[in-house]
């Protein structure tokens, strides 16, 4: 996975008493509140970007447009952060779309550069799990049992593994 660089070497230093660790950007604050373990691991990365959430009505309209029912966790993520991206990861509601594979009803929810650029993150109908599609060989692997565990557990593990 591509490397990220914290914005400051002091990121591991404890904050002064009474100082807030909350980011100034409202979308990043929402990301921190929803996915605390993920944010603790990546909050200082220079290239971390988060976009403000969508309204519940906009999320419902996106589900209707894509003809795909989102999991409860994906809906919650989208109402807090419509996009999360950094080197090697991109999950953006505006880029969601059906996968072009015969006989598949999967939805592409993003890109995750674990092995190769352009590998995809997928969700399946009526399944809250997050899957990884390796473009090179077409292999599909379950990454996590849900969106929150994907960010808070799986991504954190991959970021800090050798």
Predicted features and spans:
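A surface-exposed partner-binding patch
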Residues: 2-132
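A generic alpha-helix preference that emphasizes hydrophobic side chains
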Residues: 106, 147-148
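A short, surface-exposed interaction/processing loop segment used at functional sites
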Residues: 129-147
